């Protein structure tokens, strides 16, 4: 039996800090972020199915979201303003991410590679599934901004403005439902939500 470093690499997601250029009241790592994105993506899929006539596998979407940033164990977390500074950088970084996804997949025992391929290789995801994971990713960044701003950290004001635009561009009925139903609580204290 051959040794595999796949899960040892995934365990390092907790060592990669998000928002590396921002002063944060509460730090966030890629592992924590991925779990929150999985929660939100699962909810978006369920909302789409129950409220807006969707037919998407919510559990599959949750697992896709768990792995959506897994390549960062090999690439690190490049700040969004850098990643999307211009189309050429964004295009080249996508190539780097794709190579990292392939390398990560190749770490698995061969007999399991096809089972993990749909989750580790982002190009294997359907457009509808990818859209929900991207929406959840943006919502989680937005919720982080709300939390930081509520704690008096104005460092996140511009990031929130940018995310307001991103959310408007990706707007769907299920996103509106989620944001109207769940987002306001992120601006409240523990006493207020208890």
From Swiss-Prot:
Q: Where is this site: Appears to be important in orienting the phosphate for catalysis?
A: 18
Show the GO MF annotations: 5'-deoxynucleotidase activity; metal ion binding; nucleotide binding
CDD domains this protein is in?
HDc
Pfam families assigned to the protein according to its UniProt record, in alphabetical order: YfbR-like
| Residues reported in the UniProt entry to bind substrate | 18-19, 33, 69, 77-80, 137
- Ranges of residues in domain HD: 30-142
The entry's a divalent metal cation-binding residues are 33, 68-69, 137
Q: Where in the cell is it found?
A: Cytoplasm
Q: Which SMART domains match?
A: HDc
Q: Which InterPro entries match?
A: HD/PDEase_dom, HD_domain, YfbR, YfbR/HDDC2
Role played: Catalyzes the strictly specific dephosphorylation of 2'-deoxyribonucleoside 5'-monophosphates.
Under the subunit heading, UniProt states:
Homodimer.
**Name of the molecule in the record:** 5'-deoxynucleotidase VV1113
Origin species: Vibrio vulnificus (strain YJ016)
């Amino acid at each position: 039996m051959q040794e595999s470093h796949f899960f040892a690499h995934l365990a390092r997601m907790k060592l990669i800090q998000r928002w590396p250029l921002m002063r944060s009241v509460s730090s966030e790592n890629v592992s924590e972020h991925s779990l929150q994105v999985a929660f939100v993506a699962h909810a978006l899929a369920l909302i789409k199915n129950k409220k807006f006539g969707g037919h998407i596998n919510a559990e599959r979407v949750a697992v896709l979201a768990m792995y959506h940033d897994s390549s960062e164990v090999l690439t690190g977390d490049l700040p969004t303003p850098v990643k999307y500074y211009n189309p050429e950088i964004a295009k080249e970084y996508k190539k780097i991410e794709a190579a990292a996804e392939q390398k990560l997949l190749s770490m698995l025992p061969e007999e399991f590679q096809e089972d993990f391929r749909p989750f580790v290789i982002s190009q294997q995801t359907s457009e509808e599934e990818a859209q929900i994971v991207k929406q959840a990713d943006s919502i989680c960044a937005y919720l982080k901004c709300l939390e930081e701003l509520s704690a008096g950290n104005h460092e996140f004001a511009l990031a929130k403005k940018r995310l307001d635009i991103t959310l408007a561009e990706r707007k769907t009925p299920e996103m509106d439902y989620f944001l109207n139903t769940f987002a306001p609580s992120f601006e409240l204290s523990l006493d207020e939500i208890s």
